[in-house]
C-alpha cells in the first residue's frame, strides 16, 4: 500500500498509519487543466444553421468583405462608397452592439431623412394613441366585452346584437376524429372512445 501515489489514492495516510478523512491531493496528475469538450460543442452552430448561412448569406458576406454595402438609407449621403472599407462593426467576426430600443432604430441617418421623417413620427404616434384609446373606450362602453355579460336593454345600440333574440345554450361538442388504433368498438359503449 505504500507504493501508491498520493495522486491516485483517495486517502492520505498519517504518520502512525491512521486513515484521515478524504481530501484532495496537492499533486496534479496533468500539467494542463482539463477543459470539458462540451463547452466547445455547445457554442458551435448546428449543421442546418451553417448550411442556411452559407446559402442565404454568402453574397452578403462577399459584399462586406469586398468593401461594398447596399445603401441603408434614403439619400446618397448616407450610402457608403464602394471604395471605402466597411466599418469594424459590419465585419462578421466583430461583436455586435447591444440591442437598441426599437423606436430608436428608425431614427434618420441624415438631415434630408430627418426633414422627411420629422412630420411623420408625431402623426404615427398620435394615430396609434388614438386607435389604442378608441379600443379602450369600446371595451369600457361594451359591457359584454368587459364583463362577459350581456348589456342592459337601455344600452343596446345598433352596432350590438339584440340580446332578446340570442338564445343561450351549452356549446355542442363536435366529434373528434381519432386514429383507428385509439378507437375500440364494442356493444357496451356504442363505439365511443375509451
Swiss-Prot record:
Q: Where is the composition biased (Polar residues)?
A: 90-103
What keywords are assigned to this protein? Plasmid, Transposable element
Tell me where on the tree of life, at the top rank, the source sits: Bacteria
Specify where the region named Disordered lies, as residue ranges: 73-103
The protein's name in its UniProt record:
Insertion element IS136 uncharacterized 21.2 kDa protein
Per the UniProt entry, what species is this protein from, by scientific name? Agrobacterium tumefaciens (strain T37)
Amino acid at each position: 500500500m505504500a507504493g501508491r501515489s498520493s495522486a491516485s489514492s483517495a486517502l492520505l495516510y498519517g504518520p502512525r498509519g491512521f486513515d484521515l478523512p478524504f481530501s484532495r491531493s496537492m499533486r496534479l496528475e496533468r500539467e494542463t487543466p482539463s477543459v470539458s469538450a462540451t463547452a466547445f460543442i455547445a457554442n458551435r452552430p448546428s449543421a442546418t444553421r451553417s448550411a442556411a448561412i452559407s446559402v442565404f448569406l454568402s453574397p452578403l458576406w462577399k459584399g462586406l468583405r469586398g468593401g461594398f454595402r447596399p445603401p441603408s438609407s434614403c439619400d446618397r449621403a448616407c450610402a457608403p462608397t464602394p471604395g471605402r472599407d466597411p466599418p469594424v462593426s459590419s465585419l462578421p467576426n466583430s461583436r455586435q452592439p447591444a440591442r437598441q430600443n426599437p423606436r430608436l432604430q428608425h431614427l434618420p441617418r441624415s438631415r434630408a431623412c430627418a426633414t422627411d421623417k420629422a412630420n411623420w413620427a408625431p402623426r404615427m404616434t398620435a394615430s396609434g394613441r388614438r386607435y389604442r384609446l378608441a379600443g379602450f373606450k369600446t371595451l369600457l362602453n361594451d359591457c359584454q366585452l368587459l364583463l362577459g355579460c350581456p348589456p342592459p336593454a337601455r344600452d343596446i345600440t345598433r352596432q350590438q346584437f339584440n340580446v332578446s333574440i340570442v338564445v343561450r345554450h351549452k356549446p355542442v361538442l363536435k366529434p373528434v376524429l381519432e386514429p383507428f388504433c385509439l378507437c375500440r368498438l364494442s356493444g357496451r359503449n356504442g363505439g365511443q372512445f375509451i
